[in-house]
């Protein structure tokens, strides 16, 4: 596996874990969480773009962060 492929895999794996963990925090399905994050642009703008900052945190912390961010962004619309 090439470096860029491995790097992409790590980013996607992290995003999936964060989405599923955030969904559990909010009591919604993974699909609903994905769709809501996608609508707000948070999958790319928060989880993928900030991977280097976020992946060093605990999964519980990331789930809290992405859930809180989603709820705040949804309020602004």
List where the protein language model places each region.
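Short, charge-rich amphipathic segments
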Residues: 1-7, 44, 52
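Long, compositionally biased
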Residues: 50-77
